Amino acid sequence: AVADADLVILAVPVGAVGRIAEQILPHMKSGAVLTDTGSTKRSVVRDVAPHLRDDIIWLPSHPLAGTEHSGPGAGFESLFDERYWIILPLDADEAAIVRFESFITGLGSVTERMSPDYHDKVLALTSHLPHLIAYTIVGTAVDLETQLKNDVIRFSASGFRDFTRIAASDPVMWRDVFLNNDTAVLEMLQRFSEDLSYLQRAIRWQEGDKLEALFSRTREIRRSIIDAGQD
């Protein structure tokens, strides 16, 4: 299936990228481009490296688009519109990178170049940690006593419903994300834990000024996201 392809996209959980690359690379034609859509990049670069050929253009990438649904049926026409698609140039030829970027912008996306390490740090905070928090909050609800759990579900407000949507994401995919971006996720989780402890102390000691100051700062992040067209 890949023998005549000019571009091959590995759209599988990050834990499977290396294995799939090993299977298909021998059959790809010379000069073809290989990319992926994984949410962790250091592990993908590491896992694909042993199987690469000198005549294949390897351009790891990550489209920042999608929903809690997965698989071919989860796609829709405007999925990539105005969404960032991160490219990791590595050692690829500039002309090949530009051609790939043209393909991406043709889908409606905006391209951005990053290194593997920087990508994984950014995504640890903007994507991976929020998913971990969502899984934890919904898991806490699951473990409540029956009556309380039922009422939590029955009277769930928009905030909790948003968490349940995120927590409905594919468990295998996210298992692989956390195991393969463990260093960056743990670093961001430590920072989050310290900030959470700060909030805990502020609530305990009725320090409303500290709470209000934090909430005011975080509103600016929301406004920045809207201004950037990433709402």
Where are these regions (language model features)?
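Interdomain hinge/lid region at the active-site interface
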Residues: 149-218
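Long, positively charged, glycine-interspersed low-complexity recognition regions
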Residues: 220-231
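Rossmann-like NAD(P)(H) cofactor-binding subdomain of soluble oxidoreductases
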Residues: 20-73
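Rossmann-like NAD(P)-binding element
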Residues: 1-33
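Short, hinge-like loop/turn segments at secondary-structure boundaries
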Residues: 9, 51-54, 75-79, 128-132
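Residue-level detector of anion-binding/catalytic polar loops
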Residues: 7, 57, 110
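Internal alpha-helical scaffold of NAD(P)-dependent oxidoreductase catalytic cores
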Residues: 79-165
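Glycine-rich, N-terminal phosphate-binding loop of Rossmann-like dinucleotide-binding domains
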Residues: 11-13, 38, 89
